[in-house]
């Protein structure tokens, strides 16, 4: 499992979410948006997206859960967590696929934020 968290200022929540929904699947021939959920309560909102892609290194599929939260005009809190790319039964071996998926998302996010 690999985790990335970032606080994002001066971005529109919906615009950033839509760009990530489009760019993450476009970044890999096997990546797909599998599911999503949105919550809103007063000025607070939270969006969760689950992406999945094939890991050539691990020979399996792994997931990335993207969570974005914002309360009113406060900064956006983003969390990205990958899972499922390791091998073995009792301990984690070969998490390279998880780390690579997360690195790709970090790079995409930086490109989007530089626009």
Feature locations, PLM:
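Generic structural motif
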Residues: 10-13, 53, 71, 83-85
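Positively charged, small/polar-rich N-terminal and surface patches that mediate targeting and assembly
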Residues: 28-29, 79, 84, 115
């Amino acid at each position: 499992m690999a985790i990335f968290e970032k606080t994002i200022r001066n971005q529109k929540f919906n615009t950033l979410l839509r760009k990530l929904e489009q760019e993450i699947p476009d970044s890999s021939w096997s990546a797909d948006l599998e599911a999503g959920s949105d919550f809103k309560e007063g000025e607070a909102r939270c969006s969760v997206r689950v992406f999945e892609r094939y890991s050539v290194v691990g020979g399996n599929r792994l997931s990335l859960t993207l969570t974005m939260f914002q309360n009113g005009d406060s900064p956006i809190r983003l969390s990205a967590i990958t899972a499922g790319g390791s091998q073995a039964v009792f301990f984690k071996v070969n998490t390279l696929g998880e780390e690579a998926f997360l690195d790709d998302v970090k790079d995409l996010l930086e490109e989007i934020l530089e626009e």
